[in-house]
Amino acid sequence: PSASLPKHYPIAFNLIPQIDVFLDNLYTKEEMKMINETRKIMHDDEMRITATTVRVPVYRSHSESVNIEFEHDLELKDMAAAINAFPGIQMMDDPSNQIYPMPLYTSEKYDCFVGRLRRDESNPNTFNLWVVGDQIRKGAALNTLQIAEVMIKNGWLEK
C-alpha cells in the first residue's frame, strides 16, 4: 500500500483494501482525496459521499462501484438513456450475457464505460452502477476539456 509501511502483501491473486496511509478518521489518504475531489468537482462541500479504495492486480483502468441518490424517482430506462447520451461515456450493460465494463477490455480507450446499472434495493430514488475508465487516457486534462466543451455547448460557460 505504501513504501513507508512495514507490511507488504502480494498483489497477484489478491485485493488490498488500502491505498496510501490511514488517517485519524480511519479513511486512507486516497479515499479522502476521492471524497474531496468529488465535492470540488460538484461545487458542493456538503455532499455526502464515502469511498473505499482497493489495490487490485490490473494493468490499468480505475474501477468504481457508484451509488447515486436522487431527490426524485427516475425510471431505470431514463437513467440509462441519460448516461448513454453523455459524450465520452458508453453503456456496456447486458448482465444476462455477461457484458459489463472490465479493466482488461476498457484500457487504452478514451471513453468511460458504465454497466451493472440497477435500482438500489435498500434506498428509494437510488441507483447503483459500475464505472471503468483508463486513468491514463481519460485523465484530468482530457476530462476537463470535455467538461468545458459541454459547459460551453449548454451556455453554462462563455468562450
Set out the residue ranges of the language-model regions.
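C-terminal active-site/capping subdomain that shapes the small-molecule cofactor and substrate pocket
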Residues: 46-159
